[in-house]
Swiss-Prot record:
The lineage of its organism: Eukaryota, Metazoa, Chordata, Craniata, Vertebrata. Homooligomer. Interacts with rev1. Interacts with rev3l. Interacts with fzr1 (in complex with the anaphase promoting complex APC). May interact with cdc20. Its main location: nucleus. This is Mitotic spindle assembly checkpoint protein MAD2B. The keyword Nucleus applies. Adapter protein able to interact with different proteins and involved in different biological processes. Mediates the interaction between the error-prone DNA polymerase zeta catalytic subunit rev3l and the inserter polymerase rev1, thereby mediating the second polymerase switching in translesion DNA synthesis. Translesion DNA synthesis releases the replication blockade of replicative polymerases, stalled in presence of DNA lesions. May also play a role in signal transduction in response to DNA damage. The gene is mad2l2. Coiled coil: none annotated. It comes from Xenopus laevis.
Length: 211
């Protein structure tokens, strides 16, 4: 058994690669399952050895990719606490918030076999849970949109400003109404614990969705 710090083997970069790839798949699947966009813009693919739905819409894909591209350096430095997919009604009030809580251990204890051996299996379980989450959620009103929020640790502010200059992708402070819902229903979906990553996914659902 070997103990490593986060600096060894460029550990932060490994976690960021894994997590950003997963989050891209997860966001597409949430948008499909919750019918934020017409089903016709999605195509069936295979990720983590299970079928998923991925958007074919260039502008939508670019927004998701650009956001995660800018989040990636923050994950490398362990500056990200949450990534949130917020589904908004026509009045831009949140009806659902899919919250991915992320934590990375400061030390790793790994065996001689693969560092990542169990992680893909755990992420597959998240994807399968998202695929059937509509069974525990109420229907959303028509005409919904979405936005991606990133909750960072306080020390991340300077890093975000640097990334904004380099990537030419503006970070905007989230509106209070996007961040909070009054007395939402909380639905836990999945939790994982591995040597390199801990993650929890839950949904905050607005009690009254009709507009």
């Amino acid at each position: 058994m070997t103990t490593l710090t986060r600096q060894d083997l460029n550990f932060g970069q490994v976690v960021a690669d894994i997590l950003c790839e997963f989050l891209e798949v997860a966001v597409h699947l949430i948008l499909y399952v919750r019918e934020v966009y017409p089903t016709g813009i999605f195509q069936k693919r295979k990720k983590y050895n299970v079928p998923v739905q991925m958007s074919c819409h260039p502008e939508l894909n670019r927004y998701i990719q650009d956001t995660l591209h800018c989040v990636k350096p923050l994950i490398e430095k362990n500056d990200v606490e949450k990534v949130v997919v917020v589904i908004l009604d026509k009045e831009h009030h949140p009806v659902e918030r899919f919250v991915f809580e992320i934590a990375q251990p400061p030390l790793l204890s790994i065996s001689s076999d693969s560092l990542l051996s169990h992680v893909e299996q755990l992420l597959r379980a998240f994807i399968l849970k998202i695929s059937v989450c509509d069974a525990v959620l109420d229907n959303n009103p028509p005409g919904c949109t979405f936005t991606l929020l990133v909750h960072t640790r306080e020390a991340a502010t300077r890093n975000m400003e640097k990334i904004q200059v380099i990537k030419d992708f503006p970070w905007i402070l989230a509106d209070e109404q996007d961040v909070h819902m009054q007395e939402p229903r909380l639905i836990p979906l999945k939790t994982m614990t591995s040597d390199i990553l801990k993650m929890q996914l839950y949904v905050e659902e607005r009690a009254q969705k009709s507009t």
